[in-house]
Structures are given as structure tokens and as C-alpha cells.
Amino acid sequence: MGRRLKRDVFPAHLVGNVVDRRSRSRGNEGRGPVSRRHRLLAAVALLAACDTSPSSDDAFLTRAERTDYRETSSYADVVDFLQRAAATSPSVHYTTYGYTTEGRALPLAVVGDIDDPSPASVRASGKTVVYLQGNIHAGEVCGKEALQMLLRDLMAGRHSRWRESMVLLVAPIYNADGNERVTLTNRGRQHGPFGGMGQRPNAQGYDLNRDHMKIESPEARSVARLFTEYDPHVAVDLHTTNGTQHAYHLTYSPPLHPNTPPAIDAFLRDGLLPHVTGEIRDKHGWEYYYYGNAFARGGGEPAWYTFDHRPRFNNNYIGLRNRIAILSEAYSYATFEERVLATLYFVEEILDYVHEHGDEVRRIVADADAASVVGESLALRAVPERSAEPVDILMGATVEEAHPLTGRPLLLRADTQYVEAMYEYGTFAPTLLERVPQAYLIPADLGDILTRLAAHGITLEPAEPTPVDIEAFQIDSVSTAARPFQGRNEQTLFGSYKPTQVTPAPGDMWARADQPLGRLLFSLLEPRSDDGFANWGFLAEQLEIGGTYPIVRIPGG
């Protein structure tokens, strides 16, 4: 637990510094920064009466702000910022939620009217819990800076009503090891920070945003434990994107897996995301839209394609945990300052909406947890699905600049935009369905699988040595990728289920699908799942052509 004073305090003149820096954001003249200035000046008047003096003029400026956005925060910067925030404000608590490959503790600020930062205290509050994550790719640093700025605003008394309904879990630096591997050439054409940024993978060489299902990294296991113990209702994952030269300052995505609970998809697509987009446009004059890149496939016309439905990705994984997840992708070719502000504005509007709709958020999550998926036909594989009609996409342009230190070419967003109508591939349609069983039987000798299931928070129970009618998957063939990905050669199994009977052996465990994580369990254990344990090769030694998949199941009707 962090040290706390008796009341929230924040140096008044530092709030003024923040106003001046934000007012320079290009394209915002007379809009967002003006209203933001008025709000912060009101905070100045309030905080000027506080009896605490700042230790320095830069006490709560981020490294990005102190260096005029030439640099980004180090791991030590972030830890120090969060610890000092906890020492200054009674509503900010400092803790950690795990470790990196190289042993760095993963810092977490827990913000709200709670007694301490423990999962028990947070869950006992009965409030909506929101997890905010930055820096899963350590070259994409805008979220790391924006979350520190958000904390500072909360300390200054802004958004005080959020504490009535929410507890925030703020994790600015998830890929902490990658963050410390700074070079001037990481993310080559990204426009700043010119002083360098970290690398995409962690210290093991893993892309942490592909590790949520196989959880081979300590970081992925740490965040899975956080999801299980704190059980946030909403999660926001903050990135920077590049690719297509569009005119959006930020693009976003809900969970994309077809097995995402429909109520979560509707809440985001029909409610939160359109509302937030409109608020950003009205307040700041910037356009946001669904994540995508414009390109042509097979010689056809260009279309707007989202990324991938598989739950190895953070927001898709969280959707299969029955939670509301949002991906944020600030535009790489905007200036570093604009990317940070675009991310900050996005998070603020999300939190405003969640605050106003807290009862609905908690009900959607509770209903998804209570609903059994046993007997449902869920997707094992999927393909992008074309929109019924073309949509208007705002395209843009860039100008090339030279990196001031290396001379390498950089791209800078130009203040131009035009509309191009194209089909959108923003959702996914199942290509292979399977009925969810009642339960899976995992043999005792598959200890690694049992350990990984437990790491995800899946509930397991001992199997009694009583004969039971089951289905076993008979393997017709196995296709193995020639090249490794994430250190593993992915595998595709072909075959079909056959009825038979087994008697569980000592140590065998049941994983029942009638549990809140039933959707996730299904994707992890089904042999033909495109992102399950079989896909990642964890069962390769047990697979034989003509043999059976070692994990059997009780059919779901």
C-alpha cells in the first residue's frame, strides 16, 4: 500500500503548466483545449488553498512533458510517478500485480474510494472496476504517458464523480522489460519520441499481445491473475498503430471473436463507441473510427480491414472472459504529443460513459457470467465478414521528414482528409462450429495443460473413478506450420468425435463448461480451435494419426 496524506493535493502552478502544453495541440484551436483550460483553471483556484508545496516545478509532469515530447518515460519514471501519486492522494493506492521476465515488478495504481489496493477491497466496493493498460508493445508509448496524465488530473480533483461509481486499475507499463530496450530506430517511421522508445517484444522475444492464450510469459500470467483476482468489468488496451495513411487520430476495436457475448458487442458498437466518437468530435475536432487498414485483396477494390478475431489478442481474450474490452490505436504518424492527447481524450470519454452506465455494465457482465454456454454452437474458426454496404472512410496523407538525430525518414500526418467509400471487413463469421460440451476430462499426466488452465482462472475439480460416457476426438491428420511463430510451430488438427466410455484415473480433472469462463475454456481445449492449446503445439507429443486427442469430453446435448 502506498503512503497517503489526509486529502488530495496537487501543486496549483503545475496544473497551469499542463494547460499551456495541451493548448498547443494542432487542429484543436478554440475547441477541446479551451474547455480543458477552463476546467483546469478551476482546479487551480481550488488547489491553491492546499497546504502542501511542490518539491519542484516538474513534480508531476511526465518525462514526455518535461522534454517537450522528445522522450518517453522509463520504468523508473513510471514507478516513481505512481508511488508519489499514492503518497500524495488518499484515493490513489500503489501496488504491483506480477513480474516481468527480468524480474521487474509490474506497477499498478488502484484509484477509488477503497481502504486498500487489494483485490478483496476492490471487489467488496461493489463498484464498476475498469482496467487501463499501456505499453504492451513498448515502442507504442502514448498510453503510458496518457495514463500518468490521467492520474495527475484525478489528483487535481478532476472527474471526482467517477469515484462514486468506479475503481480504476491503472497499469501504464505492462511490457516493462521491452520499455528499457530503447533505441532511436525502434518503430522506424513513427513520428517521435525522437529520443527513442522501447521494443515491441518482451525480454523473451514474445509479442505479449499474442500470448494471452498460451500464456508462456510471466507478464501474461501476471495479467491473467489480475483479471481473475480483481475481475474488472471493463478493460482498455492502449496502442499506437501505423499502416494506412488515414485521417483518424485514433482507431478502436471491440472484441472481434464471434463467441463474444452478444450483449457486450451491442453495448460497445451501439452505445459506447458511437457516443465516445461524437464527444471527441464535438470537444476536440478530431475523428476516431473502427480500427482498420485499406488495401486490396486478390486484385479487387480496396476495402477497410480490421485485424484478427483470435483470442491471443488482448481485447478478444477479454471478450471471451465475458468482459467489456476496448482496443485503442493512436495514429503513428500524428505527432507524439497528439497521440498522447488523442489517447487521453479517448480514455476520459470511455470512463465518463462507463460512469453514466455503471448499472448496465455490471448487469451485462453478471448476465454473461450466469448464462451457461453448454449445448450452444460456438465458433472454432472464422473469416472476415464484409459489410452489407460500402462505408465512408476518411483517408489522409503524410509528409516525409528526417529524424533530427539519425536522418532516417519519418512520416508526419498532413492536415488533409478526403472521403473514400469502400466495403468494411470489421466483423468475423464462423467457418467451423462445434457444440459446447458439459465438461472436458484432462488426464493427470497433462500437468502443463492443467497448470495453464489454472493460470487462466479456469475452475477444475477432481474426477471420480466412475465409468462415464464421453466423446473422443479421432485424429485423421495434423498439419504443422513449417516456421515457428512465438517460438512454436502451430498445428491444425482434422478429425471427428466418436462416442466411447472411459473411467477417469487418479489425478484426472474435470473442467466444466458451465462456469463463467466457459467460452474461454472451449477455445482453449477444443482440438480444432484456431487458438487453443492444440494449435500452439502443447499436445504435439500426444498426437498420432488414427489415434485420439488426449482430452475427452462429455457431450453437451
Give the residues covered by each predicted segment.
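Serine residues within intrinsically disordered or low-complexity segments
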Residues: S23-S25, S35
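Structured catalytic-domain cores with a bias toward divalent-metal coordination
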Residues: G16, R36-H38, C50-G557
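Sec-dependent N-terminal signal peptides
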Residues: L40-L47
